């Protein structure tokens, strides 16, 4: 998953043929191996050595945030390689994982899930984490920008409202990282072993870039419509 993103960041430093092969390999592993049609198009975290599903805690472990994050990497690769069908597939997969992982009772996206609906091994499974929601903001707004699917915009607005109203500290800098299932601050710490200066600035920057593009497009469309007397 990370290699999908890294490939685009360092492709100007390495041989073009090597990078294209690397991108193709990454796309295949994510979209043809870990994405499982028999699970309705959901993405799993762990497989047997022969790429079959395994029925154990690790094999049933689902991480909606990871899958949704991976999909905006794939969208970027699809754009770079001029493969619109890949962009659409990544967008559709992101929406499936989002609908799957969304907590319909309290809102927010579950941290971990079990694909068979069994109790997850991880005790923190029902927490709501900052990075999961930030990466989802990127995926949904990129999906809307690249495909025009209104579902992406609807989800972006829903996730945006949840994220800014729950994770942002209104009194002090930096965001909270860990909420309980009800969306209440579980840990007041702003940094630690797993929460560093990465997901938040990258996420805000990525969203800003896409929203700037959309803003320019809207201004251009409005200007053209005015010129035509619409």
Please tell me what each predicted stretch does.
Residues 1-220:
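Glycan-recognition and catalytic cores of secretory/periplasmic carbohydrate-active enzymes
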Residues 221-230:
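Single conserved hydrophobic/aromatic residue that forms the stacking wall/gate
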């Amino acid at each position: 998953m990370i290699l999908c993103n890294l490939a685009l960041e360092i492709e100007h430093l390495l041989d073009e043929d090597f990078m294209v092969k690397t991108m193709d390999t990454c796309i295949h592993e994510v979209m043809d191996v870990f994405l499982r049609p028999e699970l309705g198009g959901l993405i799993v975290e762990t497989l047997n050595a022969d790429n079959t599903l395994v029925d154990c805690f690790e094999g049933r472990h689902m991480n909606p945030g990871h899958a949704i994050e991976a999909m905006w990497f794939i969208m970027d690769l699809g754009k770079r390689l001029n493969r619109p069908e890949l962009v659409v597939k990544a967008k559709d997969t992101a929406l499936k994982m989002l609908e799957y992982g969304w907590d319909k009772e309290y809102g927010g996206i579950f941290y971990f899930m079990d694909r068979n609906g069994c109790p997850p091994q991880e005790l923190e499974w029902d927490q709501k984490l900052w990075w999961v929601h930030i990466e989802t903001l990127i995926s949904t707004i990129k999906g809307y920008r690249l495909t025009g699917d209104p579902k992406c915009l609807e989800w972006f607005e829903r996730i945006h409202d949840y994220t800014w109203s729950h994770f942002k500290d209104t009194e002090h800098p930096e965001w909270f990282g860990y909420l309980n299932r009800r969306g209440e601050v579980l840990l007041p710490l702003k940094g630690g072993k797993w929460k560093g200066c990465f997901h938040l600035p990258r996420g805000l920057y990525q969203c800003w870039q896409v929203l700037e593009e959309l803003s320019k497009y809207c201004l251009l469309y409005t200007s053209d419509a005015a010129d035509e007397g619409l």
